[in-house]
Design a protein with these regions (language model features):
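Short, acidic Gly/Pro/Ser/Thr-rich loop/turn segments
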Residues: 8, 51-54, 104-106, 145
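Core dinuclear metal-dependent hydrolase active-site scaffold
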Residues: 28-89, 169-171
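Extended hydrophobic secondary-structure segments that form protein cores and membrane-embedded regions
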Residues: 1-3, 27-32, 136-144
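A short helix-to-beta-strand connector/capping loop
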Residues: 19-29, 40-42, 93, 133, ...
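Active-site HxH/HxHxD metal-binding segment of metal-dependent hydrolases
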Residues: 1-29
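Cap/insert and terminal regions of metallo-dependent hydrolase folds
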Residues: 79-169
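Fold-independent oxyanion-binding glycine-rich loops
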Residues: 4, 74-76, 101
């Protein structure tokens, strides 16, 4: 599921390679912005992201299963006001928020977050009632661009109230 740009890239890749999938495990489908869509046991809402300048319509996701709501903020910089407007208008209460933390301990900017901007978003989400004292805030999506290794990030992230994701982590 994705935006039209993702679907177009997928179609181009499928045409470029002669080997086709033997089954229909991948069926591309458009997911419209700000429209909750039922996908199996999940309700998924695409929200506008800020990623790479050449990407016209990148998405982050709001995913709900039963009474649990995850705000999945990967491959994005700071959230747009229209995302906050949607979350506030729809009275979204996130149980878990997974933050892009590509820049780690370095100053962030552009289409990814670092711990500095994760902390700003965490505060803004709390101030707007989207998160509360029971929300789990988890940083994820690390890279070599972060200026620190995992063991260096964990204690600093904890000071800001973040859990630091690890391979195999289940929430």
């Amino acid at each position: 599921y994705g935006n039209n740009e993702v679907l177009e890239k997928y179609d181009n890749i499928c045409r470029e390679y002669t080997v086709e999938p033997k089954d229909q495990s991948i069926i591309p489908a458009f997911l419209p912005l700000y429209t909750p869509v039922r996908l199996g046991k999940y309700t998924v809402t695409a929200l506008k992201a800020y990623h790479a300048p050449e990407e016209k319509y990148p998405y982050i996701y709001l995913i709900t299963e039963g009474n649990c709501t995850l705000l999945y903020m990967h491959d994005t910089g700071r959230l747009f006001d229209e995302v906050y407007d949607y979350l506030i208008k729809n009275n979204v209460k996130a149980d878990i928020i997974s933050y892009d933390c590509t820049f780690g301990l370095l100053k962030s900017g552009g289409g990814h977050l670092g711990l500095d901007s994760c902390a700003l978003e965490k505060d803004k989400l709390f101030e707007n009632g989207i998160s509360d004292k029971n929300t789990r805030h988890i940083i994820n999506h690390f890279s070599h661009n972060g200026g620190a290794i995992y063991d260096e990030i964990v204690p600093i992230a904890a000071e800001y109230g973040f859990e630091t994701a690890y391979d195999g982590m289940e929430v």
